[in-house]
UniProtKB/Swiss-Prot annotation:
Nucleotidyltransferase involved in the post-translational modification of proteins. It can catalyze the addition of adenosine monophosphate (AMP) or uridine monophosphate (UMP) to a protein, resulting in modifications known as AMPylation and UMPylation. InterPro entries: adnlytase_SelO, SelO. It comes from Escherichia fergusonii (strain ATCC 35469 / DSM 13698 / CCUG 18766 / IAM 14443 / JCM 21226 / LMG 7866 / NBRC 102419 / NCTC 12128 / CDC 0568-73). This is Protein nucleotidyltransferase YdiU. HAMAP family: YdiU_SelO.
Length: 480
């Protein structure tokens, strides 16, 4: 089957991009590809047959119909206007036309210098490329919307960061790479025509059912708010911290975008900061919902020339309601509650307080809670707590709550295990795969990808256990 690509962004959004080809790496080699995703998108396996990576994965060739470009956008970084940014190391190769009429961006990250590289070299390192690849697939299989990873290429090209590292490329796929920052770029240049052109493009291609609506812009923005709220609720339920929630890293589609110094909670700490450059804790785990709303307010400002202020405010006011509704539903599922009762939030908050006091492992706590039997006062989770009396007090009230549901233990346990993963991408697991890959051994990279495809399966091994002490102390920066 021949792949078909369109050039909609290039054709319909002039002055938002610069045309250029990728700069190949030296001696590029394909080290991993996503066979399942390739099958879903009808991408021929023959494209991955050349183990030396001499092809589209390493920026050495283009497929018919591709017309590569780098996009320009701006943004607020750590709450401060940063001005022009743009694709500093990534190139949009093309938009694949899918059988259902939708498209999928092919975005090559680490593709070399662009006009938007600023002081950078346009490259990505193997370390960050592996992290993003693992994270995007882990989040997908946890049910959280985001970009996908199709292939990783390594090379003999040295890249200079804090130390000399290995140059790499990642083929990243997404329904769209349109960011809040695209709108900000033209708004702050007083080019409102381009802002509206971006909105028209989004509605025409991603919200086509709104095209004939009289208030299409207001309805569209309200859905962007809802998608963002739902995304953040998903992050909070799986214990994911993004680390760099700048407006240029926010997707209008409600996708997790740009995996940098992210982290999943190990010990439950609501003030968890995964980015060691975030000295003020702006992007701490507990602050993510508020930051997302702040970012939406910045987007709303760019749309104010053609959406009424009251409509923008109404949409922004709906954020909290959607966030709490989605978060509440997911947390009730994690607790095994089929109905909503008045004291559910109190029960959850009391558990969180106990976990924070004890430093309980976030993922393991909810997974082990999935084994609860409503008529048994014993629980394997009890051994995870030092203050047994406090746990017993909470657990007795929890058992009383699940006894109000007309559900068998087997049914509830099965349901809870379907939403409480046994495995998440802990930093130490990613680092172990990276360490091996940097030595030329890709076995753990492939194995970890396979494990992350089935996060809800029962297992009792390194992937589901608490991290070792050294694994808890890993610091991650924005360097990539």
């Amino acid at each position: 089957m021949t792949l078909s690509f369109t050039t909609r962004w290039r054709d319909e959004l002039p002055a938002t991009w610069t045309a250029l080809n990728p700069t190949p790496l030296h001696n590029a080699r394909l080290i991993w590809h996503n066979a399942e995703l390739a099958h879903e998108l009808a991408i021929p396996q023959s494209l991955f047959a050349d183990n030396k990576g001499a092809g589209v994965w390493g920026g050495e060739a283009l497929l018919p119909g591709m017309s590569p470009l780098a996009q320009v956008y701006s943004g607020h970084q750590f709450g401060v206007w940063a001005g022009q940014l743009g694709d500093g190391r990534g190139i949009l190769l093309g938009e694949q036309l899918l059988a259902d009429g939708t498209t999928m961006d092919w975005h090559l990250k680490g593709a070399g210098l662009t006009p938007y590289s600023r002081m950078g070299d346009g490259r990505a390192v193997l370390r960050s490329t592996i992290r993003e690849s693992l994270a995007s697939e882990a989040m997908h299989y946890l049910g959280i919307p985001g970009t996908r990873s199709l292939a990783i290429v390594t090379s003999d090209t040295p890249v200079y960061r804090e130390t000399t590292e290995t140059g790499a490329m990642l083929m990243r796929l997404a329904q769209s790479h349109m960011r809040f920052g695209h709108f900000e770029h033209f708004y702050y240049r007083r080019d409102i025509e381009k802002v509206q052109l971006l909105a028209d493009f989004a509605i025409r291609h991603y919200w086509p059912h709104l095209q004939e609506e009289q208030d299409k812009y207001a309805i569209w923005f309200r859905d962007v708010v809802a998608r963002t709220a739902s995304l953040i609720a998903g992050w909070q339920t799986v214990g994911f911290a993004h680390g760099v929630m700048n407006t240029d890293n926010m997707s209008i589609m409600g996708l997790t975008l740009d995996y940098g110094p992210f982290g999943f909670l190990d010990d439950y700490n609501p003030q968890f900061i995964c980015n060691h450059s975030d000295h003020q804790g702006r992007y701490s785990f507990d602050n993510q919902p508020a930051v997302a709303l702040w970012n939406l307010q910045r987007l709303a400002q760019t749309l104010s020339p053609f959406i009424a202020v009251n409509a923008l405010n109404d949409a922004l006011d709906s954020y909290k309601q959607v966030l709490l509704a989605v978060y509440g539903k997911r947390m009730r599922q994690k607790l095994g509650f089929y109905t909503e009762q008045n004291n559910d939030n109190d029960l959850l908050n009391e558990l969180f307080a106990l976990m924070a006091r004890e430093g309980s492992d976030y993922t393991r706590t909810f997974r082990m809670l999935s084994q609860t039997e409503q008529n048994s006062a014993s629980s394997p989770l009890r051994d995870e707590f030092i203050d047994r009396a406090a746990f017993d007090s909470w657990f007795s009230r929890y058992r009383a709550r699940i006894q109000t549901e007309q559900v068998t233990d087997d049914e509830r346990q099965l349901q809870m295990k379907s939403v409480n993963p046994a495995v998440v991408l802990r930093n130490w697991l990613a680092q172990r795969a990276i360490n091996d890959a940097q030595k030329g051994d890709m076995e753990e990279l492939h194995r970890l990808h396979d494990v992350l495809r089935n996060p809800f399966n029962d297992r009792d091994d390194d992937y589901s256990r608490r991290p070792p002490e050294w694994g808890k102390r890993l610091e991650v920066s924005c360097s990539s």
